[in-house]
Amino acid sequence: YRNNTSSSRTLLEAAANHGVRNIVFSSTAAVYGIPAGGRASEDTATQPINPYGTSKLMTEWMLRDLAFAGGPKYVALRYFNVAGCEPGGTIGQSTPKATLLVKVACEAATGRRPGVSIYGTDFPTPDGTGLRDYIHVEDLATAHLDALRYLRNGGEPTVLNCGYGHGYSVRD
């Protein structure tokens, strides 16, 4: 909560006090929790099941309230699972500290890691592993730029999902 809620509150207060007009916020699909039917649209009820999702949702609420009070307008981008890197390797999962599934799988495939551990094999899916909707890091960067353009052109505060709308099992 310190990073995603308290620090965000401090940042939003400073932005409002210094005349910032537009904010693009990196949120998460974790705000949905486990949606009925397995799919989440922007209209799906938010019911986070972990502190990460709750803390991001709290920041979305602060953005909403600040915009309603005449502060900056915002677009909250709800990321699903970010994967990949840009060709030069400066952003994304080619960086040394990246620990996400796709990076781990690539390291295993190239012999830099002994294998991939799969946690959770009792999901109600054909192979028992969780389904994930991945989005490439470059497409996510484009979404940020598009969101900023939208706000600069007079767009109203909104929330957008950032994924492709198709899930792959962890084992896939």
Predicted features along the sequence, with ranges:
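C-terminal substrate-binding subdomain of Rossmann-fold SDR/epimerase-dehydratase oxidoreductases
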Residues: 102-172
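Catalytic helix-loop patch of NAD(P)-dependent Rossmann-fold dehydrogenases
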Residues: 2-10, 17, 21-22, 30-81, ...
